[in-house]
């Protein structure tokens, strides 16, 4: 789908030497590297991730700071989210998502006896998330901030945070979101465009209306692989944030339904693996699997919702499907860690302790 959704934009780009296979080749290389790093991650014992989780998270914060440094961070489409490594633009926020899962899992276990208190259990983690969010909003990357917040707060709740504190947080969340939206005019424009996309189809709602037209043209069975019209440079970011719209146009409701079912199965299976870890008395492994499940689940829901016009545009990719070097690499490492957790669960069930 990366090739199908990017073939026109790459074939017509002088900067890409009019190579229609540009994005396909790069994504294939990223996937190959992802398999290598994923295999390495699979070989690493889970207790090692827990041991170095705080160091990894601090390293992630340092990378978020470096993104903001002129000459280090690279600005694309008005956002400074990348660090240029000559052959690849590295996006630290993707790495921070994984590090947040590790750190929050370790934090919950270290603070297990204090998780039901506000001062010692909740506030320290809240302060860390606020700091992370501040750095992300300076880029700005509201989508990554949303995902990381859900991961951290979700793991705190699963780790024993009281219902009173959790639902109090849910009460104040809309107020914070409203403030963040009104803080930047472009976010307010996105909300206005989302509420009535056909009021300004050539302006604020251009991306959304073309996404909806793609789904409409696909109908039930789609127009066929490679037959999308919207990917012909009508729909911006067709190979990244809006790849689901291209899938909807080429494979119809049937294709989109299959994608949704596969994502649901993946997330449910991750939580199933977490349940097995709990039964094997491996709380860190359980929290890691739950955290990665939350990450893939919330990012998938937001991306699909944006494509379908259910949420305002966020700038989030669809895990495992959208084009993006850092994204696919980190996604594959995360999947490898979940496979490692499942592998250890099966060994324990057979009586082979690792």
What are these model-predicted stretches?
Residues 1-3, 7-139, 304-319, 323, ...:
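Membrane-helix boundary/helix-loop-helix interface segments in multi-pass membrane proteins
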Residues 26, 53-63, 151, 258, ...:
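Hydrophobic alpha-helical transmembrane segments of polytopic
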Residues 34, 38, 101, 105, ...:
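Alpha-helical transmembrane segments of polytopic integral membrane proteins
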Residues 54-61, 122-135, 142-182:
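Hydrophobic alpha-helical segments of polytopic membrane proteins
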Residues 74-82, 165-258, 283-288:
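Hydrophobic, glycine- and aromatic-enriched re-entrant/interface helices and adjoining loop segments
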Residues 138, 146, 222, 257-261, ...:
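Hydrophobic alpha-helical segments of membrane proteins
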Residues 146, 151-165, 229-255, 315-329:
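Interfacial segments of multi-pass membrane proteins
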Residues 254-298:
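Hydrophobic transmembrane alpha-helices and their immediate junctions
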């Amino acid at each position: 789908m990366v090739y199908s959704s990017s073939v026109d934009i790459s074939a017509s780009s002088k900067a890409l030497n009019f190579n229609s296979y540009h994005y396909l080749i790069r994504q294939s290389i990223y996937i190959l590297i992802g398999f290598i790093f994923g295999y390495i991650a699979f070989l690493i014992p889970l207790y090692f991730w827990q041991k170095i989780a705080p160091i990894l998270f601090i390293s992630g914060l340092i990378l978020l700071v470096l993104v903001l440094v002129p000459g280090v961070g690279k600005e694309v489409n008005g956002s400074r989210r990348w660090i240029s490594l000559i052959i690849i633009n590295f996006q630290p926020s993707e790495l921070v998502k994984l590090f947040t899962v590790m750190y929050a899992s370790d934090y919950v276990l270290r603070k297990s006896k204090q998780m039901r208190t506000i001062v010692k259990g909740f506030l320290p983690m809240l302060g860390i998330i606020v700091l992370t969010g501040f750095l992300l909003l300076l880029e700005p990357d509201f989508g990554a901030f949303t995902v990381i917040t859900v991961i951290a707060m979700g793991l705190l709740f699963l780790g024993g945070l009281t219902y009173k504190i959790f639902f109090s947080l849910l009460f104040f969340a809309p107020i914070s979101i409203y403030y963040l939206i009104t803080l930047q005019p472009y976010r307010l424009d996105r909300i206005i465009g989302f509420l009535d996309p056909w009021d300004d189809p050539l302006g604020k709602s251009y991306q959304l209306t073309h996404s909806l037209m793609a789904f409409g043209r696909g109908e039930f069975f789609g127009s066929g692989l490679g037959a999308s019209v919207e990917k012909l440079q009508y729909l911006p970011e067709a190979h990244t944030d809006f790849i689901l719209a291209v899938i909807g146009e080429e494979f119809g409701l049937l294709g989109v339904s299959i994608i949704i079912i596969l994502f649901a199965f993946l997330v449910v299976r991750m939580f199933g693996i977490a349940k097995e870890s709990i039964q094997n008395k491996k709380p860190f492994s359980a929290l890691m699997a739950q955290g990665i499940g939350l990450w893939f689940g919330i990012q998938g829901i937001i991306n699909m919702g944006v494509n379908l016009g259910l949420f305002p545009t966020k700038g989030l990719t669809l895990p495992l499907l959208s084009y993006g070097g850092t994204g696919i690499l980190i996604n594959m490492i995360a999947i490898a860690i979940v496979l490692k957790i499942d592998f250890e669960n099966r060994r324990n069930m057979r009586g082979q302790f690792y």
